[in-house]
C-alpha cells in the first residue's frame, strides 16, 4: 500500500470527525503534506452525541493541527435522522437506506470545506468516505465524489482536488493503513465510531460491528504473515 507520496509544496484540508476513518486520513495527510500544511475542518451538524466533537478536538490538539469548527446544525431542523435524534432507534429496513443516513450531509460538508479552502488558497480536500464497506450511503460512492468535485470547480471557478484515500479499502485495509503509518494503537484508543455515543464503543451498533470486525480480520491476517 503506497502511503508516502511527499507533497510538501501543497496544503490540504481534512474533513475530520474524530472517527477511525477521518483520523487515519489525517495521519496520512500529515505524512504526505507535512503537519504544517494540514488543517482540519469539523462540522457540528446536530449529532446526537457530544463525544464525537470532543474526540475530534482532543485529537487535533494532541497533534498540533489547526481545526475549524463549522455549525451546520440547521440540518436538524430540516431532516429527521437517527444520528441527530437521541430517541431514535438505529435500524435498517430491507431494501431501504439505514436510518443513520443523513440526506445531503457529505454534499454540504464538501461545499463548506471548499468555500473555506478557497479562502485559504487550498485546493486539496481530503475526506474519509469509503465505497467498499459503505452501508448503502449514496454520498459515499466514488461517482458522487467525482461529480461533486466537478460541481465545486464549476461553481467557484477554482481547481479543487477531492481526495478519498479510503474509497476502495475494506475496514481491515483501513486498519492496515493505520498500522503502516505507525498509528494503529493511537487510532484504536483515541477515535470514536460508535453510533450510541459510548466511550470505547457499544460493540453492537453497525458502526462498532464494522470497526471491530475489520480490526479482528486485519490482526488475524497480520498474525498469519508473521508466523
Curated annotation (Swiss-Prot):
Q: Molecular function (GO) terms listed?
A: ATP binding; ligase activity, forming carbon-nitrogen bonds; zinc ion binding
User: What pathway or pathways are given for this protein in its record?
Assistant: Purine metabolism; 7-cyano-7-deazaguanine biosynthesis
State a single Pfam family of this protein.
Answer: QueC
For this UniProt record, the keywords arranged alphabetically read as follows:
ATP-binding, Ligase, Metal-binding, Nucleotide-binding, Queuosine biosynthesis, Zinc
Q: Which reaction does it catalyse?
A: 7-carboxy-7-deazaguanine + NH4(+) + ATP = 7-cyano-7-deazaguanine + ADP + phosphate + H2O + H(+)
Supply one GO BP term: queuosine biosynthetic process
Q: Which cofactor does it need?
A: Zn(2+)
Residues that bind ATP, according to the entry? 16-26
EC number(s) per entry:
6.3.4.20
- Residue positions annotated to bind Zn(2+) are 194, 202, 205, 208
- Cofactor comment text: Binds 1 zinc ion per subunit.
* Enzyme class, broadest EC rank: ligase
In terms of PANTHER family, this protein maps to: 7-CYANO-7-DEAZAGUANINE SYNTHASE
What family does the Swiss-Prot or TrEMBL record give for this protein? Belongs to the QueC family.
Tell me, in a sentence or two, what this protein's role is.
Answer: Catalyzes the ATP-dependent conversion of 7-carboxy-7-deazaguanine (CDG) to 7-cyano-7-deazaguanine (preQ(0)).
Q: What is this protein called?
A: 7-cyano-7-deazaguanine synthase
- Which organism's genome codes for this protein? Haemophilus influenzae (strain PittEE)
The opening ranks of the lineage are: Bacteria, Pseudomonadati, Pseudomonadota, Gammaproteobacteria, Pasteurellales
